[in-house]
């Protein structure tokens, strides 16, 4: 029986759908929560894909209804990784409750947040 690597095993249980495009990666959160249980997987995705050459991420949070400090931390990790590579992270589809948490945390000045996917995609080019 073949052994699966840790990352491959985690892929089986991810709360995210990943789309590889020619000049960017779209990460769609399929969970309604971006919390301490889900955030490590998002961090792993940022690290894995950036280590494999990706320098532009589009994060779809349309399904996310709840985000805690772990979720915000995961997004900050992705943002930091991409800034170090002179890349870009854009986020779209944030619901009002999550937007409020981001604003209270004063991260609305840190993240590149857009209303919809098309506007987000236009801003990574």
Language model regions located:
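Short beta-strand/loop segment at the start of cytosolic alpha/beta domains
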Residues: 2-27
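Short hydrophobic/aromatic patches at helix-to-coil boundaries
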Residues: 16, 121-125
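A short acidic, often aromatic-flanked loop/helix-cap motif at beta-alpha or helix-coil junctions
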Residues: 25, 119-122
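Flexible glycine-/small-residue-rich
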Residues: 29-31
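Amphipathic alpha-helical interaction surfaces in cytosolic regulatory modules
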Residues: 33-111
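Acidic phosphotransfer microenvironment of two-component signaling modules
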Residues: 96, 118-119
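Short acidic-hydrophobic, aromatic-tinged amphipathic segments that line or gate anion-handling sites
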Residues: 112-116
């Amino acid at each position: 029986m073949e052994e699966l690597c840790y990352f491959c095993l985690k892929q089986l249980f991810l709360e995210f759908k990943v789309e590889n495009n020619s000049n960017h990666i779209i990460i769609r959160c399929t969970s309604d929560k971006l919390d301490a249980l889900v955030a490590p997987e998002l961090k792993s995705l940022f690290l894995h894909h950036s280590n494999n050459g990706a320098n532009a991420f589009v994060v779809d949070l349309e399904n996310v209804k709840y985000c805690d400090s772990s979720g915000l931390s995961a997004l900050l990790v992705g943002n930091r990784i991409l800034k170090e590579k002179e890349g870009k992270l854009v986020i779209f589809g944030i619901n009002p409750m999550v937007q409020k948490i981001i604003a209270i945390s004063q991260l609305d000045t840190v993240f590149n947040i857009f209303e919809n996917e098309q506007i987000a995609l236009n801003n990574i080019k």
